[in-house]
């Protein structure tokens, strides 16, 4: 599909009637109420509560005033709707500001001032320096004589470096006067969200040009939300407007992620719903039987002789209404509120602010904080994520000679400096490729120095290194490049740029030497993308050895090459290149095919080696998280040896004898199958052995494994704690995440670049690092952090606390609802199983919304352990990963507690107040008071760290309960007139409260004391140590039970196995890190295995979906 945009012609562009109005609003003034209600009632639980509320309107079956259900329902829906309205109002204000911004357009040669929302497709938009681009434009002219302008794209892709944009070749030389009256047509694709591509063609009408077709790329565009910088003015024709711009198409509502805790809460809710139906059926049948056998014998109960057809449904429906409170109506609002607070805690954490850049952490997704505490696998990018992405040129190999090996710095290598001085041909060519085979822009600073603006850190490092070696890239004027070398000036004309792509893994520049007219191809790229295309007869073994050597040192390598072209060869190729560049369909593929025809018979000049240092705290972070039972997979596009050395240096894997690498390689299906089978066999054998085993696989072998041996690879994924996947593409990264998710593991993906976005979005939790490659990953992620080391605190502190708090909040919500419901059920047995409510409507309405909510919301600041203890003992994360605090077993405990407390409240209340002069309202108020007192003590008992706010909320809530009820007791029409005054004046009331609390909490406190004293968990021991102010415990102190084959944690002493299968492949012996971090046989080493290794040894307990 394509569209035609007519330049400066309103009539011809009428069919493209989309204006430039931006709308990110979800609602309008007229559809807000119906649309919001539709969204809320699309959820099953809300439909259920609405049905209950509607049944309450049937006076024959409702046991209480309908307001007791409609009140909380309306309140909760109003809270949700108000939040949506508030968010949408802010979106409206943002849209209004953007739409009403004034811009200049040119019509028929006349400038006009209009609002941005009135721009039409085909209008020529005029921009001045520092203006924001209001829509997607094709650049037509700039104030620069060479047709160049500079834009800042930070709002679009997060990259802060200025980028160059150039006018199409068809517009070069058109003066300002004619520019205003330009006519032509642009053939472009239909709107899409790909900000990296714009495959279009432009044809200007006479008298501007002779109808020649000019191809357009993304470099000829100015995209919406970019800013014009360092350019006096620029103008362009609008091709996409409004929500059809690339930015507008990128906007969208991300698919919500369901946390493991939410899934468990849904299952438990379903179980309670089934239990409720059973109770309703049993009591409904019992009620009808009692009515037919006993009630008609009572003289004071008058039933009609002939009952209507629905008579048998009345009592069951009445019990349905009575038991509907089993499922707490407030749980969703409560969880949404506390989850929002969890996100704010992350953003307010001053210890997660990058001091270098001032970047704070940010939670874009407020709904999944609990999943941080249940992470089992972390899949991480390497460059910019584990490393600093500060590239420094360290070594090189030119013509088989190694430079920089002695002192680790080629820039100070005397031999290299002598070669430059003597004019070595290979060295000069090598430096030339370093200097100009790139997209770097040299800019003159105010101090007169040359500053390089590069889109790639690698290119920046190479250009700077070349300048330090006297090959200085001085300036770029349109297609003319100027280099200064040893006092002489060299000029090149750029004929074509063969851009880098992830498939080609190289880039080339075709230049013409202005001194001798020679046409030269300069290339640089990965070794596998350059060396196979070396000219016949050239020995590349030394270059290959250099790549291998540098990779073993953890350095990033690029091969540089050179080829002189015949003019006829270039001209023939140029025609095909322009044809491919003008295609609208499959342009990228056809360009790559044409480039391949030129990039051959290359003369390999040498190899560069660039250092990318690890970020501060990376080894410590990975070591700590591995102790927490989290498995690590490194997914990188870098070379195998480089990735391995980085993995060694950052504690990703352990050197021999404690660590072992298994290689999966091969170029054919048969080779990969054999290698995979060999590694899988070894992993099965060593699954129960305490050895740190990891596997390594490259992108090619991974592609074959996923296509032909997916089941075996999935088994390997289950068995492996650590994996290093090299030379992988963005799509393969996402595939690996999906494989682990299919096995029901909770995954976290972390990266910093645009190539990590798919992986981040695919994972259960996506974390983006605000790095030097921009903010694309950070914007696509659920959480954004400034440094990798903050991941430790994000998981161990915020993730764990969030899990603990939500586990308590959700189960307590069910507990308090079940408690009141069980009392209603018990009361039915002494009221003829009629479905009569013990409590009045006001009490029921206030119970869930007010009386029992405040203490729970304050529990979001509760901490079972101090942050220091959590960070020092990461092994306790196991309780979250295993779901120990929220599961059917723990829920059964809360269920039993609610039943026990209901029995206590009911029995004591009945025995104390069931006498002739006691009113039913008094009985209900005594029972309700007992519930409130019990719940205050339950919250106090479950609270680990008391603050003034928590004391005020727990005990102040009790005071508030009495204040509210005294107020209602003073109102004659409330139905509670004088009840509270009468009760509180009776000593028996306070004795009853004391008995209820004593009988209800005594066994609970005794059970807790027994557990803490005689069967303490690791957390209990740490809590006792904190309270006593004792020394920091070691892991050995914590481990009180022998290891069982389950997802548990315990220290393991690892020794060198006596007999090692040939399948074991040693780590690189010449690695400096391996030497530095080597351990002798028998050295004890404490680490905690995750479920992946443990479960696999007992029949692979994970249920993987069919892949």
UniProtKB/Swiss-Prot annotation:
Reactions performed catalytically: ATP + H2O + phospholipidSide 1 = ADP + phosphate + phospholipidSide 2
Q: Where in the cell is it found?
A: Endoplasmic reticulum membrane; Prevacuolar compartment membrane
Domain of life, source organism: Eukaryota
Is rRNA processing tagged as a keyword?
no
Q: How does it sit in the membrane?
A: Multi-pass membrane protein
Query: Which cysteines are cross-linked by disulfides?
Result: none
- Topological domain (Extracellular) residues are 56-60, 291-315, 828-841, 913-919, 970-982
Q: What is its EC number?
A: 7.6.2.1
Annotated Mg(2+) binding lies at: 752, 756
Q: Where are the transmembrane segments?
A: 34-55, 61-83, 269-290, 316-333, 808-827, 842-860, 891-912, 920-942, 949-969, 983-1007
Cytoplasmic compartment ranges equal 1-33, 84-268, 334-807, 861-890, 943-948, 1008-1107
A GO biological process held by the record: phospholipid transport
Report the function annotation for this chain: Involved in transport of phospholipids. Contributes to transmembrane flipping of lipids. Requires an interaction with a protein of the ALIS family for activity. Specific for phosphatidylserine and has no activity with lysolipid, phosphatidylcholine or phosphatidylethanolamine.
Query: What is the name attached to this protein's record?
Result: Phospholipid-transporting ATPase 2
Organism phylogeny: Eukaryota, Viridiplantae, Streptophyta, Embryophyta, Tracheophyta
